[in-house]
């Protein structure tokens, strides 16, 4: 037995630390080493819950007043997992890189090569684990399990959005975590299927493209962006969300994900600064009793590309960290758009929301405010 394996074994098994600490979709160095305050104990523990994989989904029946949530990861799992790790940009970290940055958090038996994937695929699996708390809370609130799909899964099975996927769904959550270099784009048939979905009364489309870092070809500007967010696991260029951009273009959603901005912290608590919420515009009450989302060091600014204030409503903005310069703040900005709403219009009976996917991926490290936001989405229409 290798000494490394022996050391891991003697640490003891117990409950995996991923059940007790924050583990967000883009695993940042800071998140690996800290746990949000007021963490809420989970009511369902992963190790005690049956987990399915590679199964045909049984459609959920409609229940009045109880929403059926679906998560759709826009990536090609094989293409992301098989990226050349000698490439510096536009790829996910390997699990080995995560372990190095987060040491010694992942030096436990459950993270060894005997039990967990060590390459990029291991990091992708962290993302899947990171939605379990959200699934539990929403499932308890609605009485329906949250279904999780991938555009192209581990087995290479392609699942475009169509009437079958959307048919048993009331709230469709599009998690835009595909690197643009992998060329995932919504087809005309998918766009039409989503448009048809939104003609159904009571539907909601949540679009969550992640950050777009390093757009400029100027190395100095890329370095400024990197120094601003300060996460060693994020390369100097990491551009996400071609699929969501193509979907939004097809649906006429005048919004674009830009930058990767570090939220400001409250000097009193060192936690993420409170949202600037436009509560008078929040007609559905999604932000009722919600003061903050969760801290993530590189969040997108959702730039509105139309002057029509009735078409898109900015419901919340996040103060940005001013301690390190960034092109966004140098242009005079102090807050970035973080939660947007397109109310029903014309033949579209459903709502369209925009919020970064990491808001839904805190694994057993959420706060009361975040739990209330999730519950509001599940129960308010």
Task: Cite the ranges covered by each PLM segment.
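N-terminal export signals
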Residues: 5-24
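Short, surface-exposed patches at the edges or C-terminal ends of soluble domains, predominantly
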Residues: 27-381
């Amino acid at each position: 037995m290798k000494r490394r394996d022996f050391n891991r074994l003697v640490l003891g098994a117990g409950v995996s630390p991923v059940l007790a600490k924050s583990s967000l979709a883009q695993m940042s160095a800071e998140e690996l080493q800290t746990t949000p305050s007021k963490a809420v104990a989970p009511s369902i523990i992963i190790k005690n819950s049956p987990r399915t994989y590679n199964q045909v989904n049984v459609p959920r029946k409609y229940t009045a007043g109880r929403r059926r949530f679906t998560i759709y990861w826009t990536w090609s799992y094989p293409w992301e997992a098989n990226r050349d790790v000698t490439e510096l940009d536009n790829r996910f970290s390997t699990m080995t890189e995560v372990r190095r940055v987060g040491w010694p958090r992942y030096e436990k038996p459950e993270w060894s090569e005997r039990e967990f994937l060590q390459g990029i695929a291991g990091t992708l699996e962290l993302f899947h684990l990171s939605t379990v708390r959200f699934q539990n809370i929403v499932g308890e609130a609605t009485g329906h399990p949250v279904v999780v799909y991938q555009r192209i899964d581990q087995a290479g099975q392609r699942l475009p959005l169509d009437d079958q996927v959307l048919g048993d769904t009331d709230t469709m959550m599009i998690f835009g975590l595909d690197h643009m270099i992998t060329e995932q784009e919504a087809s005309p048939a998918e766009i039409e299927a989503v448009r048809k979905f939104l003609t159904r009364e009571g539907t909601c489309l949540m679009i969550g493209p992640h950050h777009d870092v390093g757009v400029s070809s100027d190395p100095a500007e890329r370095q400024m962006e990197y120094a601003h967010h300060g996460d060693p696991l994020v390369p100097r260029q990491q551009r996400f969300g071609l699929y969501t951009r193509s979907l939004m273009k097809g649906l006429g959603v005048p919004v674009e994900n830009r930058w990767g901005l570090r939220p400001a912290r409250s000097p009193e608590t060192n936690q993420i600064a409170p949202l600037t919420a436009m509560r008078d515009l929040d007609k559905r009450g999604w932000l009722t009793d919600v003061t903050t989302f969760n801290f993530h060091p590189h969040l997108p600014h959702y730039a509105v590309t139309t002057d029509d204030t009735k078409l898109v409503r900015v419901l919340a903005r996040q103060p940005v960290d001013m301690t390190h310069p960034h092109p966004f703040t140098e242009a005079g900005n102090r807050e970035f758009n973080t939660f947007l709403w397109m109310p029903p219009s014309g033949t579209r009976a459903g709502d369209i929301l925009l919020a970064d996917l990491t808001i839904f991926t805190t694994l057993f490290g959420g706060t009361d405010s975040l739990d209330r936001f999730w519950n509001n989405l599940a129960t308010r229409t």
